[in-house]
């Protein structure tokens, strides 16, 4: 299709704040409605709090007061305050700030001069007030545009106050989750010992840093030994082993949670293995040493380089070696001092090695069996690009885990063959709760799915950025969804912890007349559509994905319109108990729950 009238009039120039409003995803990631912890409204809060914490790190102000009234957020710190003559520029002009100067800020996340400006641009109301030496300067903005400003005398303590209301024109209907906010504030407190966060009169404070953090994430009964903890000015970590599968990490850079890891996390993993092997004077495999390891890590570095604006993965090359060297040294010293701890870790490593060798024969049989069937993975319709290659499209790659040939057929014919793969399940997968990992290799379908994802050894080889469960919106579909989540939570929980697991949202209803067709994802949306079409309309209830035609399905899985719900783990210590209740033995408690909630 040819583009008509491409001339000078088609070239437009946007101001920095206009660009933020038009392309908000470049600055805050997804928009969302507040139902997901990664939604943009939480990023707005984070950007302001980051500035307050930067003040605390530099030794100015150990309290941050945060209030939420409906959706109006206010944040007050007692740092140095923004220089009064630069308040307006500091919150409205891109690339303006003091964090380019090491004398003022040494360990900061917000080094790009964008964060606060993005909050300003994306808020219908944005008020900033800076107080220094008995004077205050305040400025009021709306959607990034200055409405008024003034300088006044003040008896308040030095510091900065920010109040904002996220713009409903950008975010639509949204609300903040109290659980998400409190979880984040607790993390801030653990990452900054001595910092007090007062949120609506609830205090968040940590005396033991990441030790408190890891204790909140793991049940003490699951620990094979007491949590090992270390802290210095630029490196802090805590770890222990459990009997769970895989490795679990919570890593941070200058207070920023890096759920995709990065060079600091790689350095920790390498240093940990070297320390154990050096102490034991053996050459155990890294898998045997780290299987079941749960660790949290925080580093403070100058000029952090992240792989995106949302700062999920650290890219500083030199950090890997520096962290590995220090971790190896510290853990070696700890092992030499604590012989009981050393024996417990050695026992875990030896047990891991034994189990791996026992598993190897089962693996070999499964691979030989798979070779006889096909050189390709059965039931996999693969895509051209993958997450573990170096293509520009790697971030867009996804695999749909669906059930039945009819649903698969609709999706195959309308998918993007470059970035969207499909793995078709044959009925309900096996319930893997409390099963041994060897059971995967005895189950052809689960084995093929694991190989298709590339996660047999670890999720470092994950072939798709998003693993999307796409099942029917009925009880059977929900059951299959739960069985798949049980499988991943049991053997590959880090796949979910690192934000790769999603649920495909497909419409429940189609409401249409001769001119308009509306797809509805809830009973509420259906009733609204019926009212808008004013009678005489046809209502179709989709019982299964196979009932949706390929032409319709194309709109539901198109990269620009797909609706995905991210699977979040709020607290890993609750996983075993929750899975036991829903997927374990049919206890009287579960029967009562079903009677009270489903019948």
UniProtKB/Swiss-Prot annotation:
Mg(2+) 2 binds at residues 472, 474. It catalyses: ATP-dependent breakage, passage and rejoining of double-stranded DNA. Binds two Mg(2+) per subunit. The magnesium ions form salt bridges with both the protein and the DNA. Can also accept other divalent metal cations, such as Mn(2+) or Ca(2+). Belongs to the type II topoisomerase family. Its EC number is 5.6.2.2. The gene is parE. GO terms for molecular function: ATP binding; DNA binding; DNA topoisomerase type II (double strand cut, ATP-hydrolyzing) activity; metal ion binding. GO terms for biological process: DNA topological change. Topoisomerase IV is essential for chromosome segregation. It relaxes supercoiled DNA. Performs the decatenation events required during the replication of a circular DNA molecule. Keywords: ATP-binding, DNA-binding, Isomerase, Magnesium, Metal-binding, Nucleotide-binding, Topoisomerase. Disulfide bonds: none annotated. Heterotetramer composed of ParC and ParE. SUPFAM superfamilies: ATPase domain of HSP90 chaperone/DNA topoisomerase II/histidine kinase, Ribosomal protein S5 domain 2-like, Type II DNA topoisomerase. Residues 397-507 form the Toprim domain. This is DNA topoisomerase 4 subunit B. It is an enzyme of class 5 (isomerase). Its cofactor is Mg(2+); Mn(2+); Ca(2+).
